[in-house]
A protein has these predicted regions:
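Short, small-residue-biased leader/transition segments that mark boundaries at the very start
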Residues: 1-8
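Intrinsic disorder in cytosolic terminal tails and internal cytosolic loops
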Residues: 9-23, 101, 105, 237-247
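Extracytoplasmic gate region of multi-pass secondary transporters
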Residues: 29-94, 146, 150-154, 158, ...
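Loop-to-transmembrane helix entry
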Residues: 67-85, 109-113, 137-138, 172, ...
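A membrane-interface helix-boundary motif in multi-pass transporters
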Residues: 71-72, 110-113, 194-225
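A late C-terminal transmembrane helix in Major Facilitator Superfamily
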Residues: 89-90, 162-201
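C-terminal transmembrane helical hairpin of 12-TM major facilitator-type secondary transporters
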Residues: 108-156
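Multi-pass alpha-helical transporter architecture, strongest
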Residues: 125-131, 216-247
Length: 247
């Protein structure tokens, strides 16, 4: 019965935000005048590149660090395990509902709390290189958990757009966030490639690792804290639930 009441409350909450706004519209320029837009865009900018780094560079990492090719049996098993762990994100979208039921928070506040929880999981990626000296399975598991956390984070950050903006503006805001995420991804992938070339050429040393492994450790450090930085800035820009009301 309580769950049914909470579902009704969730629907009522959403309806009150958008009740009189369906016929109103927001210009593309207006979108950039709201802190909520910048909060969403920054969250995407900081984190989208991490996901694509995990996907794009994982085979190269296994080859560089462990001399394991993904065309081999072990390499395929490792990549399969990484992607299988990432599928744990299926349960990530349920956490805000659990928080709402237990605390009575509004959906936006519950989503932000869930995102904070997810933002801590990528810190495990910091252990990828140190534990990689024991077995290649450890970094694969750490990266897989980081990937699962990203998808859980991503599902919730997209939902915050619907919490804060009227229906007529959701597509524009989502597009702005997607663009910011694309730019962030481009910067991270390009920078990672340049860093790996530099690290290999100069035999860079970082935290006891030399050459490309040192470069990977640097990028893993960046990826691991990106979500916490993104969340902190989002929270600073929009500390409390504040829907956009079009006049």
């Amino acid at each position: 019965r309580r769950q049914r009441q909470m579902c009704i409350r969730d629907r009522t909450y959403t309806a009150t935000v958008k009740e009189n706004e369906e016929k109103k519209s927001m210009t593309f320029r207006q979108c950039f005048t709201y802190r909520q837009t910048w909060a969403f865009a920054f969250g995407k900018f900081m984190t989208d590149g991490v996901w694509w780094f995990f996907l794009f560079w994982a085979p190269s990492y296994l080859n560089t660090q462990f001399d394991i090719k993904t065309s081999e049996g072990l390499g395929r098993a490792l990549i399969f395990t990484l992607y299988a762990i990432t599928m744990l994100s299926i349960y990530g979208g349920k956490l805000p509902t659990i928080i709402i039921h237990k605390t009575g928070l509004n959906p936006y506040a519950a989503r932000m709390r869930a995102m904070l929880i997810f933002a801590f999981f990528p810190l495990l990626v910091l252990l990828a290189q140190p534990l990689g000296t024991i077995s290649p399975w450890f970094p694969v598991i750490m990266i897989g958990i980081g990937g699962a956390a990203h998808q859980s984070w991503s599902a919730n950050i997209f939902s915050t757009v619907g919490d804060m903006f009227p229906k007529s503006a959701i597509a524009s805001i989502t597009g702005i966030g997607g663009m910011a995420g694309g730019v962030g991804s481009m910067i991270l992938q390009y920078s990672a490639g340049e860093l790996f070339v530099h690290a290999d050429k100069t035999q860079m040393v970082f935290m006891g690792f030399v050459g490309k492994p040192a470069g990977y450790f640097v990028i893993f450090c960046i990826c691991s804290v990106a979500y916490l930085i993104g969340w902190i800035v989002m929270k600073a820009l929009v500390p409390k639930y504040k829907p956009i009301i079009l006049n």
